[in-house]
Amino acid sequence: DLVRSRGLGDVYKRQILDSVDFICLNNPEKLSSETQAEMVKIREKNIRTLSCINYESLEQEWNNKAKDNSELTEEDAQRYLNERTDAMLVLCDNYGYDGILIDYTGLSMVGMQEDVLQQYKARQQNFFSRVLDWRIKHTDKTLVFYGYVQYLAPENMDMLDKYNHLILKTASSKNMEDLTLNVFMAIQAGIDVAGTNAELVPKDRFIACTQFPQQEDKDMIIGYWDTRDANGNKVLAAQGTAQWIVQASPDYTCTGIFIINIQKDYYNNTYGTVRETIHIMNPNK
């Protein structure tokens, strides 16, 4: 099980569950000495800490830079993105992270104009080639892909077996059927590229993503499914996702759950919703 948080301090002080496997930090740069010490402490509980590289954030940095200078070229863009990617990758060694989560949403390539498509594919290739170079030198670290497999260019599909986990972007899913559809869309993307006899998309390492309700969301949209329980209450997305995970499928294996912004479990300071969610997947916990 993975959780995503802005920082370790609040999570650690609230004595996060031992059954959580990974914590992913949204802001992995400029870690305080206190946070680094906490990473060591939770590692003693076999809880590992991942840094996050959000590719869209890097592109947004470049777009903000480029809008003020019309003379900048695509070559400049590639150079900037490469430098920023390298700077983010080196954080794993600098701060002693246990691995990296690659957050890459991407875009649908259907109907893209040719020049836009070529730029999209070139930037994607550059980014992931650097990630894979890092992987070769860090085989003992955990590498996680968090994104839409179907938005990867065909030439990048064969890298997926280098990742320990493939997290599906299902935070906005509203029922079990939608989760299943997301899995099959990822698998189908590999089949479309390689044919039915090849499995470019590993089927044994999927993780579903979900999120908690937010206190300011009075309409109960975020963190809830459209379905209701026996008492007529909206099903919590985290618990619905956990119930989906434990339903075995002959076509794929879902190995865990990824919870965004764990600090949103505001109901009490002992992470009650997290506990209930994990208990669904592992009644012994």
Each model region followed by its residue ranges:
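Single conserved hydrophobic/aromatic residue that forms the stacking wall/gate
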Residues: 2-8, 12
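Acidic (Asp/Glu)-rich catalytic clusters
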Residues: 14-17, 33-48, 90-95, 155-161, ...
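Conserved, mostly hydrophobic/aromatic
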Residues: 23, 102, 166, 257
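Substrate-binding cleft of extracellular glycoside hydrolase catalytic domains
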Residues: 28-123
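Glycoside hydrolase catalytic-domain groove-lining segments
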Residues: 37-52, 175-213
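Aromatic- and acid-rich polysaccharide-binding/catalytic face
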Residues: 106, 153-182
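Aromatic-lined carbohydrate-recognition surfaces of secreted/lumenal glycan-active proteins
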Residues: 124-154, 172, 199-214
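Substrate-binding cleft of secreted/luminal carbohydrate-active enzymes
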Residues: 204-285
